[in-house]
Amino acid sequence: MKDLFQGHAKERAITRRDWIQALTAGAAALALPAGIVNAQVKRGRIDVHHHMMPPFVDLWTPRKWSPQVSLETMDKFGTETSVLSVTGLTPLYADLFYDNSERAKKLIRQMNDYGAKVASDNPKRFGFFAALPMPDVDACIKEIAYTFDTLKCDGVMMFTDTGDKWPGDPLYRPIFDELNRRKAVLFFHPSVPKCCRGLIPGTGDTTLEFDFDTTRAIVSLLNNGVLAQCPDIRIIVNHAGAAVPALSGRIKDQVRNKQGASIPGGSAGALEELRKLYFEVAHATFGPPLAAMMKLAPSTQYLWGTDYPVWPYETTVGPLYDTPMPPDVQYALDRGNAARLFPKFA
């Protein structure tokens, strides 16, 4: 079973029986109280989906936030390091970031300076992903230079849409070319596009649209050639890949071979590009999304994430007791893969 989880992407034929056996094999090691589980891991988790709520932004969250509050919660749940990013808690907040105004650009710079300060004050406990002033391409290129060269960010964060465009749009290609040149880590955070708000009365937009919009973003990158032509960007997809793993067959089957250089290898090439993505598991450690993620991608691509403080740690930690995995795969998810992406936290 170890080979089943650790094998290369081309060897990902996990049957239902395989999956049940894998869960059973890991149960003895992982169906334990949190303190015992954490004690088995010599180094704590690295959380790549962890939000900061700066004091100069009046943003509602169900939990009070400060760096100290995060540290206390991280210690409680066995997390050694968190990589901070801004949040798309509401569509309005994402709109503020992407309204292309000087006010929005100033706020983004403040956010980035704040994230850098928190990380420099706690260099072993926090990193940060810089925000970009989309959709202003020139401003984004300048912010990339500032945040990487001056602030020493650990990567960048983008929302999955800019209101009416998705990241694979040719307008944004210079941004991806620059990130590719820098071999950057890029974390996508879900948003709700203007087209798809209030579609189902009584259902919050984020319930469905966060994961559907993430899937749109990844497909836009795939079909416009960004994944194939910018191979040095390490892309992190939220929520165990959102709907990408479940829809990967449809995505590959509907790729047109005439896309040529956009997706070398046609349908087979499309699937390989999806398998190269990294998948963090915030609020997605239930059996079905984990099974889909593991069917698509090898264990080298799994990352820990919690979406704290928007969601409590328990929503990600708790379901793992019902969906255990082999200890080596659990370690890769908890820490091992992130330590490769961010060597300074190794």
Spans of model-derived segments:
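Hydrophobic faces of well-ordered beta-strands that scaffold small-molecule active sites
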Residues: 46-50, 82-84, 128-130, 156-158, ...
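Glycine-enriched alpha-helix->loop->beta-strand junction motifs that scaffold or abut catalytic
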Residues: 151-154, 182-184, 232, 274-277, ...
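Acidic-and-aromatic substrate-binding clefts and catalytic sites of carbohydrate-active enzymes
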Residues: 60-64, 133-140, 163-170, 244, ...
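Aromatic-anchored helix/helix-loop segment that forms the rim or "lid"
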Residues: 259-291
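Catalytic metal-binding/acid-base residues of hydrolase active sites
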Residues: 51, 191-192, 241, 285, ...
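Aromatic-lined glycan-binding groove of carbohydrate-active enzymes
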Residues: 225, 233-272
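Active-site gating/metal-coordination segments in enzymes
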Residues: 80, 88-224, 346
